[in-house]
């Protein structure tokens, strides 16, 4: 799977040396050209080699279905960026870190837990998307509801394996009611 990224180099960089590098991941539901590029540019202005990335399934990166929610593959996006930077001419492979914005904060941390090549992680307005997907926003799903979601997903796998229609979830409520949370109303 190809991962799209924008590479930024410090102005007046000594190209005969390797430099510390930072990978910047965008918020959930965004693309690199939004806030991730801004952070990448600003960190390049401070002397870092930087790369903003589109998470797998988003923006210019490969992956179907588009805009899928796959936290384990999002963590892999950061490792793929380490592969690229660490084998290129500008980045010191022993000095590569990550900045994760919003949902990418949790994906960067997940990547660093399993990829020791990521030497530092910083988060900006981090939101744990994995926990939100497992437990609902603000832990709003009961254990029984979570078990039902898993059972429904298992049954849907059977349906799709046997040629049935793919079922997608929107990730958002379909109707605003008096019981809707402020986040749902937003």
Please place each PLM-identified region on the residue numbering.
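Alpha/beta-hydrolase active-site loop
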Residues: 35, 68-89
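Structural cue for short, hydrophobic secondary-structure segments
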Residues: 24-27, 52
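Active-site glycine-rich loops that stabilize anionic/oxyanionic intermediates
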Residues: 19, 26-31, 102
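The serine-hydrolase catalytic nucleophile loop
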Residues: 29-41, 55
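N-terminal cap/lid segment of alpha/beta-hydrolase-fold proteins
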Residues: 1-21, 71
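Alpha/beta-hydrolase fold nucleophile elbow
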Residues: 89-102
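Alpha/beta-hydrolase-fold enzymes
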Residues: 107-186
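Conserved alpha/beta-hydrolase
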Residues: 42-62
């Amino acid at each position: 799977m190809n991962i799209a990224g924008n590479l930024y180099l410090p102005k007046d960089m000594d190209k005969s040396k390797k430099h510390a590098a930072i990978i910047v991941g965008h918020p959930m539901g965004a693309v690199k050209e939004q806030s991730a590029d801004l952070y990448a540019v600003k960190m390049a202005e401070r002397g870092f080699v930087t790369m903003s990335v589109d998470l797998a399934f988003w923006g210019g990166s490969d992956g179907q279905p588009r805009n899928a929610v796959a936290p384990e593959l999002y963590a892999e996006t950061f490792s793929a960026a380490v592969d690229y930077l660490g084998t290129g001419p500008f980045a010191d492979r022993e000095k590569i870190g990550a900045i994760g914005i919003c949902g990418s904060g949790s994906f960067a941390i997940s990547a660093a837990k399993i990829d020791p090549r990521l030497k530092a992680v910083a988060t900006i307005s981090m939101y744990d998307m994995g926990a939100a997907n497992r437990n609902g926003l603000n832990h709003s799903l009961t254990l029984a509801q979570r078990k039902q979601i898993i059972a429904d997903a298992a049954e849907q796998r059977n349906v799709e394996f046997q040629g049935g229609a793919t079922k997608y979830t929107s990730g958002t409520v379909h109707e605003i009611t008096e019981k809707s949370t402020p986040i749902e109303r937003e």
